[in-house]
């Protein structure tokens, strides 16, 4: 019905996993893929009650990451199980034209982030180690597409063969917690809230078991390991040996379930410090066809007032204390501000507009192409040097993404400054290279 019904042309019901009928003929549906609660009237018409696309004031901002169940109580209140956010939501669907009674605040990360200090996945677990990748960075696919996906975790560098240690006491809950690409670069183990990638699960580089009670190595007739079995219910404690790093020379650590990944930098790792401000290499504008604006009037970039929405692009990167000089990390948040020629903000831009924030992993399959402009890519997964060109006029926050753009027609003709906000997770902000003088006419 979601794909063919004329009343549902945008596929509102795609990924429908929960349904609740009411006494007066309405039906409420939880759309897991869309992150929405959909209302179907007795006449069969669809509308979005809550989540992205809702028209009721306040309801569009409700942070539904992965609604998986829904129920209506005897008083008409609607309860939503948001599996990806570890939360139960409540709203009154009878007053959907106003903010719901149970106004939903931003979801909280898993409780384990309160563990202080939080151990690293290598020895010494309470020492310090180099972070070489953060959430939200652009990644390619090894096959020519440089903006294939966004990086979902925290990369921590160590040589191939280093033993990976569990960072929290957890119990395996998934019946298939480890990936099937045995010996591959992306071999993975997910215990519960923590996922470990780029390691040989449960064994050394020469396929010797690390812990036979937890990891059962299945061998063929020639004695080669063909499968590693990890039983559901297996318990791991902090410091337990769970694998060894493969030739990727780092472990990729993810926090949260597949559709609810939280930025692992919320974990209070000991010895992790960052006093290095991000760097902005360049700021430029792209038109609707992806062409770069390059005409100038003196020192100002000439911007056609009626040329339509533009992409504001900032090439930027970051480092942490102790990073190698060649290291290029991604930003935690970015945005922009429009200033008058005298440096005062125009109306609506009294503060920088934060448009990109990697607190949670974006869910859209095209998120990398929304966040990053062409020419972005990384040196490992793409045939180029690492470059991150952020489209700060688009939207990517709290797991949601959208193509937005900036329309110069909203301003009177004249001289302005586009000022970029580029910040890391520790609050350091780029101060140089952030301004682009423009003339709108």
Show which residues each predicted segment covers.
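Short loop/turn segments that connect beta-strands within beta-propeller blades
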Residues: 40-45, 92-95
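Surface-exposed, glycine-biased beta-strand/turn segments
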Residues: 98-195, 202-207, 229-232, 237-241, ...
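Residue-level detector of Asp-centered blade-edge/turn motifs that repeat once per structural unit
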Residues: 21-24, 72-75
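Gly/Pro-rich loop segments of beta-rich domains
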Residues: 1-15, 44-68, 98-101
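Beta-rich catalytic cores
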Residues: 15, 33, 66, 84, ...
């Amino acid at each position: 019905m979601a794909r063919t019904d004329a009343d549902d042309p945008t596929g509102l019901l795609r990924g429908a996993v929960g349904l609740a009928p009411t006494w007066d003929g309405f039906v409420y549906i939880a759309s897991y893929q869309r992150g929405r609660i959909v209302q179907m009237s007795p006449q069969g018409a669809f509308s979005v009650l809550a989540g992205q696309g809702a028209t009721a004031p306040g309801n569009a901002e409700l942070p539904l990451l992965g609604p998986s169940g829904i129920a209506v109580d005897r008083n008409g209140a609607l309860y939503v199980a948001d599996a990806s956010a570890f939360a139960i939501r409540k709203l009154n669907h009878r007053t959907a034209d106003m903010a719901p009674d149970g106004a939903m605040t931003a979801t909280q990360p898993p409780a384990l982030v309160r563990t202080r200090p939080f151990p690293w996945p290598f020895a010494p677990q309470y020492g310090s180690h180099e972070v070489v990748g953060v959430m939200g960075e652009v990644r390619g696919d090894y096959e020519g597409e440089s903006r294939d996906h966004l990086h979902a975790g925290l990369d921590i560098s160590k040589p191939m063969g280093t033993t990976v240690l569990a960072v929290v006491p957890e119990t395996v809950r998934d019946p298939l917690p480890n990936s099937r690409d045995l010996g591959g670069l992306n071999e993975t183990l997910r215990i519960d809230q923590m996922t470990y990638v780029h390691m040989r699960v449960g064994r050394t580089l020469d396929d010797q078991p690390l812990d036979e009670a937890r990891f059962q190595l299945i061998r063929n007739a020639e004695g080669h390991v063909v499968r590693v079995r990890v039983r559901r219910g297996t318990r791991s404690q902090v410091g337990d040996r769970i694998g060894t790093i493969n030739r990727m020379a780092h472990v990729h650590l993810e926090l949260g379930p597949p559709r609810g990944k939280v930025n692992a930098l919320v974990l209070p790792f000991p010895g992790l410090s960052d006093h290095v401000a991000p760097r902005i290499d360049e700021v430029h504008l792209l038109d609707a066809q992806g062409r770069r604006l390059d005409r100038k009037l003196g020192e100002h970039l000439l911007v056609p007032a009626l040329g339509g929405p533009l992409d504001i692009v900032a090439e930027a990167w970051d480092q942490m204390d102790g990073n190698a000089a060649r290291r290029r990390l991604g930003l935690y948040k970015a945005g922009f501000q429009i200033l008058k020629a005298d440096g005062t903000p125009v109306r609506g831009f009294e503060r920088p507009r934060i448009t990109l924030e990697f607190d949670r992993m974006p869910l859209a399959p095209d998120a990398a192409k929304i966040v990053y402009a062409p020419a972005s890519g990384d040196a490992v997964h793409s045939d180029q040097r690492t470059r991150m060109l952020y489209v700060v006029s688009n939207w990517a926050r709290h797991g949601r993404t959208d193509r937005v753009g900036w329309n110069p027609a909203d301003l009177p003709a004249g001289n302005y400054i586009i000022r970029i906000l580029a910040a890391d997770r520790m609050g350091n902000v780029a101060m140089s290279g952030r301004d682009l003088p423009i003339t709108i006419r």
